[in-house]
Amino acid sequence: MEEENKKMDMKIEAKGTEALLEYAKTTGMQVNEDGSLPFIGFVVGKPFKGKSTMTPPRNKEDEGSYVHLSSQDVTGEEFAYPSGELDVRSNREVKHYIAQDYDVLITNRKTKGSADYRVSILRIKPGQKVVIPDNVIAIRPTCPEMSTALRDYLNLESTREQVRNLNPSPVYSITTKAIQSLKIPGEVIDK
């Protein structure tokens, strides 16, 4: 079993960022002039505490800052959004934002005594480092292109789980170690 896991990790490491970039070029996904992907978005880390109203971002000038949403604001979920990118006025708008502007979601374990997944959103910028907490249990693409890329290049099996009604794309089970071996640049904002 350990040998199989090692092979899987090696396979994913070899198929990481370069493979996703090559796939993007062949499918017409947006690619920067220097040939790099503009960003890959993750949902990562521990949940924020629920609040009755949204709180302002830490720093409006900082792309890494975010706003908090209460669990009532987004169908029982708790999210953190990068600042300056969305005026959250309705659940529909929130869902559209997640589905359209982020390529990948990573989902936390359910919290004790709660029926909801609790997640937060990260926008990855080139050259930053990805840190994946141990409580991450799944990775989920939020666009068809990334879904196909993950399936084709990482050979992941779909568990068919979904995070509420945000997007019908499958959830792919993957270990923390395997996610880290992807070596995709980025940074967790909810430390």
Predicted regions, residues:
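Non-catalytic DNA-recognition/assembly elements of restriction-modification systems
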Residues: M1-K60, S181-K191
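Sequence-specific dsDNA recognition surfaces
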Residues: I40-P57, Q72-D101
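Flexible loop/N-cap segments at domain edges
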Residues: L69
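A short beta-sheet element
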Residues: K95-Y97, D101-D152
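A short glycine-rich beta-alpha junction/loop motif
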Residues: Q128-I137, L166-K191
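Polar helix-capping/helix-linker motif
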Residues: D152, L156-R160
